[in-house]
């Protein structure tokens, strides 16, 4: 299964996967407005490979059912919160 991957011009770390290069017909207009101008990153064969940040089976399922897959960036790390939690844990030990 081939798919084309595009990065968002408006939302850093956001990628859109579609089954056919430059065919955004299955992507809702509201999503395309929020996504901004798509910039083609690559076309890949999803068979027999893995992806760094997303489950490949979810990508395939979404491409088949919805006609696209939207990859959002991971939430930012809250280092201060992690530090506070470690300090609290150390006090309890």
Curated annotation (Swiss-Prot):
InterPro entries recorded: YcgL-like_sf (IPR038068), YcgL_dom (IPR027354)
Region (Disordered): 72-93
Domain of life of the source: Bacteria
Residue ranges occupied by any YcgL domain in the UniProt entry: 1-84
Bilayer-spanning residue ranges: none
Pfam entry (one): YcgL
PROSITE patterns linked to this entry: YCGL
HAMAP family according to UniProt: UPF0745 (MF_01866)
Protein's UniProt name: YcgL domain-containing protein VV1_0131
Native source organism of the sequence: Vibrio vulnificus (strain CMCP6)
């Amino acid at each position: 299964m081939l798919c084309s991957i595009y990065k968002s011009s408006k939302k850093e770390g956001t990628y859109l996967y579609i089954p056919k290069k430059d065919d955004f017909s299955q992507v809702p207009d509201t999503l395309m407005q929020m996504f901004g101008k798509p910039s083609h990153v690559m076309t890949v064969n999803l068979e027999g490979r893995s992806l760094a940040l997303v489950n490949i089976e979810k990508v395939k399922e979404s491409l088949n059912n919805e006609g696209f897959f939207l990859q959002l960036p991971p939430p930012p790390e809250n280092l201060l919160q992690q530090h506070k939690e470690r300090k609290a844990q150390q006090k309890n030990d």
